[in-house]
Curated annotation (Swiss-Prot):
Name this polypeptide is given: Photosystem I reaction center subunit IX
Organism: Trichodesmium erythraeum (strain IMS101)
Alphabetical UniProt keywords: Membrane, Photosynthesis, Photosystem I, Thylakoid, Transmembrane, Transmembrane helix
Transmembrane segments: 7-27
GO cellular component, one term: plasma membrane-derived thylakoid membrane
InterPro entries listed in its UniProt record: PSI_PsaJ (IPR002615), PSI_PsaJ_sf (IPR036062)
Disulfide bonds: none
Gene Ontology BP annotations: photosynthesis
Compartments, as annotated in UniProt: Cellular thylakoid membrane
Membrane-protein topology: Single-pass membrane protein
Length: 41
C-alpha cells in the first residue's frame, strides 16, 4: 500500500490524472454550453 501511494504521488502520474480531469471538465462544460468556449475573433 505504501509503494502504491508513493507511485501515485509521482509527477507523471499526477500530471496524467490532472489532464484527464481537466479534459473531462472541459468536455462536460462544452456539452452543456457549446458556444461559451469559442468566442468569435
Amino acid at each position: 500500500m505504501q509503494d502504491l501511494l508513493k507511485y501515485l504521488s509521482t509527477a507523471p502520474v499526477l500530471a496524467t490524472v490532472w489532464m484527464i480531469i481537466t479534459a473531462g471538465i472541459l468536455i462536460e462544460f462544452n456539452r452543456f454550453f457549446p458556444d461559451l468556449l469559442f468566442h468569435p475573433m
